[in-house]
């Protein structure tokens, strides 16, 4: 899914001229947010015109417009990077950047989210952010709009409901993001969409089948997303008998080797109202890190040692067979997982001290990995840092791990590279990709099949509307002409 460092360095050399130009332009942008460039054109108008550039490609995002869990949010294919984010009314918006012509197209609205048109609840629900796929025929797919589905959709057979409806939009033409249509072929009871296309073209859509107290499932398509099979549960929610709570989960699914998918996840103790620590009731309390494999050819699930697992996996089985790390009193927020060149899994997990808030407290990104015999790691990427951090990573050799992490520094939002040549035990900060005053960043997972110029999407949050979205690469953001916004 993510190109290795050799391919990235090769592409970086080919694009050296453009990156140098972008860097020159951005010298002014970093101070002012806008840069002016003179250009000579073969037109009937003035020979010298001034073009103003900005670092962002869109400024109409709302709420929390990006997250790592809904992935991929962007894909690079045939020299074009396709990007998506949550725009006005929580609708999905899609744009493209052509790396050869340096031209942006869009953003275009890809669908209509029920979350932005619901009665009651918070101003922004934020759970229906778009997830993207490009099928073997070139059609662009967007999955969006659900926070478990609504009771008006009927009874959820695999859990409970909340708001919205999980939807599936597809472009009307291959590789064309200007026109879209909805396909009524997935259950409305969904949220946290994650989609993977296998080498043979089969599509696997993973999501939680409802609100907090629901199973995690997948639906499979063998016809480029035109139809999907019924949901199959792979993580089980169930009532606990020892405390006033329900077993629940948060998962991240990615491409493994060959026909395999890899799944990392953490456990959510879903307390009843008035129960739990200090009677806080339902909070975001989560703990521990788990890992398992899914062989899509044989339909067999297994743990890291190859031991078979029966579906759906329960808390008891997960603790016994798939546990990668106990986090103790630390609360978690799940991250991503990838394989190194030896086929060993590496997991990003965010964990922090419970400070009594509804969300516990700030969580810091940590690295956990399997060395072929045992699970190791758990150290902070940013040693000594106690604020909020989030990130995704590439790993080639077990001793060559590279994270792109956002964190707070001196009141600024920072996105920078962090590198480890010590098997993930310690990391050092490299170049800063983006830094903004008096803001926070929300980020996507690393872009699928990423181009060196376009590695990740970043939302600059100063308020909850008119949020700027950036496409950032190895050395900074891809600029866009202000007149083209």
Swiss-Prot record:
<feature type="lipid moiety-binding region" description="N-palmitoyl cysteine">
    <location>
        <position position="34"/>
    </location>
</feature>
<feature type="active site" description="Proton donor">
    <location>
        <position position="127"/>
    </location>
</feature>
<feature type="binding site">
    <location>
        <position position="270"/>
    </location>
    <ligand>
        <name>Zn(2+)</name>
    </ligand>
</feature>
<dbReference type="GO" id="GO:0016829">
    <property type="term" value="F:lyase activity"/>
</dbReference>
<keyword id="KW-0472">Membrane</keyword>
<keyword id="KW-0732">Signal</keyword>
<comment type="function">
    <text>Ulvan lyase involved in ulvan degradation. Ulvan is the main polysaccharide component of the Ulvales (green seaweed) cell wall. It is composed of disaccharide building blocks comprising 3-sulfated rhamnose (Rha3S) linked to D-glucuronic acid (GlcA), L-iduronic acid (IduA), or D-xylose (Xyl). Ulvan lyase catalyzes the endolytic cleavage of the glycosidic bond between Rha3S and the uronic acids GlcA or IduA, producing oligosaccharides that have unsaturated 4-deoxy-L-threo-hex-4-enopyranosiduronic acid (deltaUA) at the non-reducing end.</text>
</comment>
<feature type="compositionally biased region" description="Basic and acidic residues">
    <location>
        <begin position="115"/>
        <end position="128"/>
    </location>
</feature>
<keyword id="KW-0456">Lyase</keyword>
<feature type="binding site">
    <location>
        <position position="250"/>
    </location>
    <ligand>
        <name>substrate</name>
    </ligand>
</feature>
<feature type="binding site">
    <location>
        <position position="64"/>
    </location>
    <ligand>
        <name>substrate</name>
    </ligand>
</feature>
<protein>
    <recommendedName>
        <fullName>Ulvan lyase</fullName>
        <ecNumber>4.2.2.-</ecNumber>
    </recommendedName>
</protein>
<comment type="similarity">
    <text>Belongs to the polysaccharide lyase 25 family.</text>
</comment>
<feature type="lipid moiety-binding region" description="S-diacylglycerol cysteine">
    <location>
        <position position="34"/>
    </location>
</feature>
<feature type="site" description="Neutralizes the sugar carboxylate group at subsite +1">
    <location>
        <position position="208"/>
    </location>
</feature>
<feature type="active site" description="Proton acceptor">
    <location>
        <position position="192"/>
    </location>
</feature>
<feature type="binding site">
    <location>
        <position position="282"/>
    </location>
    <ligand>
        <name>substrate</name>
    </ligand>
</feature>
<dbReference type="Pfam" id="PF15892">
    <property type="entry name" value="BNR_4"/>
</dbReference>
<feature type="binding site">
    <location>
        <position position="282"/>
    </location>
    <ligand>
        <name>Zn(2+)</name>
    </ligand>
</feature>
<keyword id="KW-0449">Lipoprotein</keyword>
<feature type="binding site">
    <location>
        <position position="212"/>
    </location>
    <ligand>
        <name>substrate</name>
    </ligand>
</feature>
<feature type="binding site">
    <location>
        <position position="129"/>
    </location>
    <ligand>
        <name>substrate</name>
    </ligand>
</feature>
<feature type="binding site">
    <location>
        <position position="126"/>
    </location>
    <ligand>
        <name>substrate</name>
    </ligand>
</feature>
<feature type="binding site">
    <location>
        <position position="147"/>
    </location>
    <ligand>
        <name>substrate</name>
    </ligand>
</feature>
<keyword id="KW-1003">Cell membrane</keyword>
<feature type="region of interest" description="Disordered">
    <location>
        <begin position="108"/>
        <end position="128"/>
    </location>
</feature>
<dbReference type="GO" id="GO:0046872">
    <property type="term" value="F:metal ion binding"/>
</dbReference>
<feature type="signal peptide">
    <location>
        <begin position="1"/>
        <end position="33"/>
    </location>
</feature>
<keyword id="KW-0479">Metal-binding</keyword>
<dbReference type="GO" id="GO:0005886">
    <property type="term" value="C:plasma membrane"/>
</dbReference>
<feature type="binding site">
    <location>
        <position position="268"/>
    </location>
    <ligand>
        <name>Zn(2+)</name>
    </ligand>
</feature>
<keyword id="KW-0564">Palmitate</keyword>
<keyword id="KW-0862">Zinc</keyword>
<feature type="binding site">
    <location>
        <position position="212"/>
    </location>
    <ligand>
        <name>Zn(2+)</name>
    </ligand>
</feature>
<dbReference type="InterPro" id="IPR036278">
    <property type="entry name" value="Sialidase_sf"/>
</dbReference>
<feature type="binding site">
    <location>
        <position position="208"/>
    </location>
    <ligand>
        <name>substrate</name>
    </ligand>
</feature>
């Amino acid at each position: 899914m993510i190109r290795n460092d050799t391919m990235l360095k090769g592409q970086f050399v080919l694009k050296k001229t453009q990156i140098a130009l972008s860097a020159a332009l951005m010298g002014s942008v970093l101070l002012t947010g806008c840069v002016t460039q003179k250009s000579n054109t073969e037109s009937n108008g003035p020979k010298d015109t001034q073009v103003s550039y900005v670092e962002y490609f869109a400024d109409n995002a709302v709420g929390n417009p990006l997250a790592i869990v809904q992935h991929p949010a962007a894909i690079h294919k045939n020299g074009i990077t396709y990007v998506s984010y949550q725009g006005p009314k929580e609708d999905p918006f899609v744009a493209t950047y052509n790396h050869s012509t340096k031209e942006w197209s869009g953003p275009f609205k890809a669908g209509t989210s029920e979350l932005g048109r619901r009665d009651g609840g918070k101003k922004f629900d934020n759970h229906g952010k778009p997830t993207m796929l490009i099928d073997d025929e070139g059609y662009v797919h967007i999955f969006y709009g659900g926070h478990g589905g609504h009771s008006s959709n009927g009874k959820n057979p695999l859990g409970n409901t909340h708001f919205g409806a999980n939807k599936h939009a597809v472009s009307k033409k291959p590789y064309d993001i200007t026109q879209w249509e909805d396909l009524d072929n997935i259950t409305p009871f969904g949220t946290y969409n994650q989609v993977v296309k296998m080498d043979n073209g089969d599509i696997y859509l993973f999501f939680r089948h409802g609100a907090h107290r629901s199973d995690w499932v997948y639906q499979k398509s063998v016809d480029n997303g035109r139809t999907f099979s019924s949901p199959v549960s792979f993580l089980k929610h169930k009532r606990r008998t020892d405390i006033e709570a329900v077993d629940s989960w948060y998962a991240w699914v990615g491409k493994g080797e060959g026909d395999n998918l890899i799944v990392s996840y953490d456990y959510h103790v879903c307390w009843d109202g008035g129960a739990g620590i200090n009677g806080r009731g339902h909070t975001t309390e989560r703990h521990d890190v788990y890992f398992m494999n899914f062989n899509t050819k044989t339909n067999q699930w297994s743990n890291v040692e190859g031991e078979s697992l029966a579906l759906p996996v329960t808390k008891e089985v997960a603790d016994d067979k798939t546990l990668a790390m106990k986090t103790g009193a630390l609360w978690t927020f799940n991250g991503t997982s990838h394989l190194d060149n030896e086929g060993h899994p590496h997991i990003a997990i965010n964990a922090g001290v419970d400070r009594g808030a509804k969300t516990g407290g700030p969580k810091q990104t940590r690295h956990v990995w399997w060395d072929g015999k045992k699970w190791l790691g758990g150290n902070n990427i940013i040693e000594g840092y106690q604020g909020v951090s989030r990130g995704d990573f590439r790993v080639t050799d077990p001793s060559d791990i590279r994270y792109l992490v956002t964190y707070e520094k001196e009141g600024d939002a920072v996105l920078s590279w962090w590198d480890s040549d010590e098997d993930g035990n310690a990391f050092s900060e490299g170049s800063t990709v983006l830094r903004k005053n008096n803001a926070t960043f929300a980020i996507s997972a690393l872009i699928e099949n990423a181009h060196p110029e376009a590695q990740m999407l970043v939302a600059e949050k100063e308020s909850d509307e008119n949020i700027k979205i950036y496409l950032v690469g190895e050395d900074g953001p891809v600029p866009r002409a202000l007149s083209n916004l």
